[in-house]
């Protein structure tokens, strides 16, 4: 295909960017002034006010970590997308930066959609993102018209940027509207770009482009087509090499699949983010060697983006409130990101994702409970009122007889709680929200391998923030992220055993510091 990659960027300004950014800042500030903090996170990244979704433009640049994110600054529902921005020099203490992008060009007049950041050969950063317009010029009833855009920062602090314009147009006869979320990397002496596409036949694909100068791009081929004909779009694609401890390299293709059907424990969310591991030769199609696997098995995880800081592959995900009711929309804000996770390729041939080592620096006070034994249907309160904590615990599977055992978090006086447990009958870790007083309910499960079950112990790291929980199983072999809307009053954490006994080999509870965004 040719004719849709211009020789030079194309742009048509329809609004003043500085004025649009000032209006967006005022919109966020108005909602922040009236924000209810009952579920607002203490150690997760969220906007000061308004709606957020996908993490964007993740990078470590000139000594600072930068996290951008999709932002609607005028409401707590999805709306015209901007790019919010926070930065940190240590991943522990974050500061709010000016909003980076507002939709001001004809090519993006209905939204500055998701994209990535990459450092060029000259050491300077470039932003690639999707410009979004409604195809009928009015609303979503006529579908999308989406193109790929380029911008460059004005300073090393990344507090503002200059939009260069459209670099890849959309061949409308080859695409069923969806055409977005560019990811750029270098292999050998060429730059490559991929993004998600819904083909004219409504098949979810990732297209591959190449460039010598990061500005002029040439279409190469379809990098990957999802084998499931129900999947019509691959949002927020990711693509990166990774080596195991022995130095053997694989390629990972990640995407958020739209159209997957639930089957048993798999794909229970409206859309599901996952990956495949395989091989890739530049210019060729990706060759998967594994089935589709979920990045995260919780209720609320979507649109992850990873980046390499020179030593580690780090990923953030969006804790996505897809299913109504969404109580936090009444509080002046909606949505937060997960903790940053390091991706590693384990000896088992699968990816592991665990909180980056820096997260240990958020711990303030630690209570070491040592070993704990609970009798049949036993219960022990380990925190009377836990606003923001991390729990490390190891369950002795061989010595425990409980059918389910674990932690009731956000346990309030009205009887509401969220349950993080090991279910012996199904051999899985569960987040169960059946006792939640507010928000969506249901449960999600993370599988344990036969090897893990046979090991005789289960290690859990449970991060509890004001309105969400993240669970890491056996050093990151599985991860789970879910919202948990606590009722009013003290929020206890209780260790429980159901229909049997529980033996805990070790349990520590750490209170967590704020990351400075409250």
Locations of the language-model features?
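Beta-rich carbohydrate-recognition and catalytic domains
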Residues: 2-181, 186-234, 243-297, 312, ...
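Beta-rich accessory regions
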Residues: 3-4, 25-31, 246, 279-518
């Amino acid at each position: 295909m040719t004719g849709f990659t211009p020789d030079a960027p194309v742009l048509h300004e329809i609004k003043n960017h500085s004025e649009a950014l000032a209006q967006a800042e005022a919109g966020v500030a108005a909602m922040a002034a009236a924000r209810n903090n009952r579920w607002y996170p203490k150690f997760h990244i969220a906007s000061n006010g308004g709606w957020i979704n996908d993490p964007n433009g993740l990078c470590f640049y000139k000594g600072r970590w930068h996290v951008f994110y999709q932002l609607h600054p005028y409401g707590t529902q999805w709306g015209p997308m901007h790019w919010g921005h926070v930065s940190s020099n240590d991943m522990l203490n974050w500061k709010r930066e000016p909003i980076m992008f507002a939709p001001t060009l004809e090519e993006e007049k209905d939204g500055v959609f998701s994209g990535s950041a990459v450092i060029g050969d000259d050491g300077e950063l470039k932003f690639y993102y999707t410009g979004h317009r409604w195809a009928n010029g009015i609303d979503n009833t006529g579908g999308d018209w989406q193109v790929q855009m380029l911008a460059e920062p004005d300073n090393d602090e990344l507090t503002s940027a200059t939009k260069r314009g459209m670099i890849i147009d959309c061949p409308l006869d080859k695409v069923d509207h969806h055409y977005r979320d560019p990811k750029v990397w270098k292999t050998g002496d060429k730059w490559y770009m991929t993004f998600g596409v819904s083909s004219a036949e409504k098949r979810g694909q990732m297209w591959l482009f190449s460039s010598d100068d990061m500005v002029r791009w040439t279409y190469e081929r379809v990098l990957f087509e999802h084998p499931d004909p129900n999947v019509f779009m691959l949002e927020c694609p990711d693509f990166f090499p990774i080596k195991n401890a022995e130095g053997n390299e694989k390629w990972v293709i990640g995407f958020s699949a739209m159209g997957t059907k639930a089957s048993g424990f798999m794909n229970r969310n409206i859309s599901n983010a996952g990956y495949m591991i395989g091989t890739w030769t530049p210019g060729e199609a990706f060759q998967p060697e594994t089935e589709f696997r979920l990045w995260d098995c919780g209720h609320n995880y979507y649109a992850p983006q990873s980046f390499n800081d020179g030593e580690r592959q780090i990923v953030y995900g969006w804790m996505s409130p897809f299913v109504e009711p969404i109580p936090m929309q009444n509080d002046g804000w909606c949505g937060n990101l997960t903790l940053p996770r390091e991706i590693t390729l384990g000896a088992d041939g699968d990816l592991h994702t665990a909180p980056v080592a820096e997260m240990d620096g958020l711990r303030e006070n630690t209570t070491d409970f040592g070993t704990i034994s609970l009798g049949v249907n036993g219960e022990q309160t380990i925190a009377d009122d836990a606003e923001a904590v991390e729990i490390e615990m190891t369950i002795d599977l061989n010595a425990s007889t409980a059918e389910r055992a674990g932690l009731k978090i956000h346990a309030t006086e009205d009887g509401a709680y969220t349950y993080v447990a090991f279910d012996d009958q199904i051999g899985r870790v569960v987040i169960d929200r059946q006792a939640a007083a507010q928000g969506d309910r249901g449960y999600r499960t993370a599988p344990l391998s036969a090897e893990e079950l046979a090991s005789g112990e289960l290690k859990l790291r449970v991060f509890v923030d004001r309105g969400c929980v993240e669970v890491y199983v056996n050093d990151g072999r599985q991860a789970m992220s879910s919202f948990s809307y606590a009722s009013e009053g003290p929020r206890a954490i209780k260790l429980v055993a159901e229909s049997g006994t529980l033996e805990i080999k070790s349990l520590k509870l750490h209170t967590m510091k704020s990351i400075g965004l409250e």
